[in-house]
């Protein structure tokens, strides 16, 4: 009996020990997740306690009436309610009432469900009866617009909706198939995918190529990349990674442009080929693929460096205050606080402030690093991060000398975000042609948005009018369709409230 009791106690002790170990593992996991959350928050805001000596006042913008802001851009239809003539009688004396005016009561937004109809296209034909009498057939047929996709029943409006639903609303083609069926049209995923590929080849890619030519004349370009899976990539496994490279002009550019460039790998030759002939500054996260491009100046992202230090913080954030990683985060936060103060200044004034306020902090940052480099293990997270910062010191200092260089590459990261959100829904591209088409579509849509255009209206206009142009005879006509052209902005710019 005693042996049995002893065995039971030992088993319970073992169970408790295992549970205790599991609890500690869970605590570590939670702490790690909390650390990650803190890191993500820090990408967009500085630590409040670090701003005491570098403060600024933000003037709260007075809000307009919310209803006006939401409804100003919609068509308004006036509906007036009247009293039946037989009821226009005074309740007091029975006399006939006289009209004195009307009053506004409220707004109501009316939703009209989408609907389809078929436009049956005919053309008239004429003949010369006089020539006919002489045995000669002379006939004249009315011209008709070229179809957006030859030998297809799609239209610019339908194809634009397919494109916007996939690339703006992140709706996969299989879900769109159900929506089109609900509207009364059987439409296969294969048809929709082929339409997008044809439209990209015939209309979008020529525009993007022209945008690329003009981008090479910019002074600064943001660069970034993100993985994408392509199922039928020649010579590669289905599970292998391909990449979507993204290049953006800086926010000060007079011609805002975003270009997505699909490539089968992450080799350095990809940005080298895309940026051939560019001799300005590229803003990147420090990926080595951007570091060997002839003729360019490299500016590196401080947010990326800060993220590395956050990752180097101990799992238990309570013990982080005395660590080198935490000190680095605090030093970087002071730099970001200065940037927040000067974000609306001209480039020249930014450089002046950066030289006066930011440069001493940057000098201190790297001097402090070099002094502490030997206090941590080279193979540790903090050691690797210190080495990263020292290796990229020149590029991290670039913003001090150039007012057009931002401290971060966040603009390009925001440009990529719609692609990454869409990728979670449609998961992969079936073919390289599909991936290239997606790159062209994203380029036009994100550039349109950067130029404050309505993406649907702009895409529909391209699909409606570009098929009617003879670009062989008049190649310069292509510039008329670029998102920043005066004609396009006049037609499709979303007006500010």
Language-model features and meaning:
Residues 1-153, 193, 222-223, 284, ...:
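Short, flexible loop/hinge motifs at secondary-structure junctions
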